[in-house]
């Protein structure tokens, strides 16, 4: 039997409208790569990265979910078992910020009650095209008592910091049991098709 190379397994989700840059954020953290064109995620795909925090090796299983409204029924089952969720909006897209409230309601309905949440104000390198003031994001974060980060996958701003802070908060919040790998289904998110979309 192969020796397990990690102490804990955390399932994290990236949630938000299509085109806000979730895939770019994920690839910047997992592969330290940035591409202006990715295939828009129709179902769900995930990346694995192991980090060391508080003396423990933690395997992060990070799921990139479809943002389109019509695919919410597909992603609902993936909330189950998530220990941390990053909500992402695009500072150049006012609708993506308005929909954060809907995503928060989705989390309340489908995720574990004690799931750790974080709000990302993405594409902060495009501040000259900003339509969502920073203060609005800070306000909604305060109202829901969640962390708030300004991020940019393109400029590599706060990506690693956000992805390390979320599991740190999970570690502090609850005593975490070591996972049974047999209970973790990583096969159902492999089917990805789609079209090209811009993200930062």
From Swiss-Prot:
InterPro entries: P-loop_NTPase (IPR027417), Small_GTP-bd (IPR005225), Small_GTPase (IPR001806), Small_GTPase_Rab (IPR050305). The keyword Isomerase does not apply. Its cofactor is Mg(2+). Its EC number is 3.6.5.2. Disulfide bonds: none annotated. A motif (Switch 1) lies at residues 32-46. It is found in: Cytoplasmic vesicle membrane; Golgi apparatus, trans-Golgi network membrane; Endosome membrane; Recycling endosome membrane. Its main location: membrane. The modification Phosphothreonine is found at residue 73. Belongs to the small GTPase superfamily. Rab family. This is Ras-related protein Rab-10. It comes from Rattus norvegicus.
């Amino acid at each position: 039997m192969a020796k397990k190379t990690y102490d804990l397994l955390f399932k994290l989700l990236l949630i938000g409208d299509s085109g806000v840059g979730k895939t770019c954020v994920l690839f910047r953290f997992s592969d330290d790569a940035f591409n202006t064109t990715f295939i828009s995620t129709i179902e769900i795909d995930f990346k694995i990265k192991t980090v060391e925090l508080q003396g423990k090796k933690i395997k992060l299983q990070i799921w990139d979910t479809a943002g389109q409204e019509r695919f919410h029924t597909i992603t609902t089952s993936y909330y189950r078992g998530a220990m941390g969720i990053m909500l992402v909006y695009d500072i150049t897209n006012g609708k993506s910020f308005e929909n954060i409230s809907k995503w928060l309601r989705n989390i309340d309905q489908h995720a574990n009650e004690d799931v750790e949440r974080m709000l990302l104000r993405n594409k902060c390198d495009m501040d000259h095209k900003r339509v969502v003031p920073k203060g609005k994001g800070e306000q909604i974060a305060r109202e829901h008592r969640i962390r708030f980060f300004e991020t940019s996958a393109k400029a590599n701003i706060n990506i690693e910091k956000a992805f390390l802070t979320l599991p740190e908060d999970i570690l502090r919040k609850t005593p975490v049991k070591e996972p049974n790998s047999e209970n973790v289904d990583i096969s159902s998110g492999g089917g990805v098709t789609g079209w090209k979309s811009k993200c930062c």
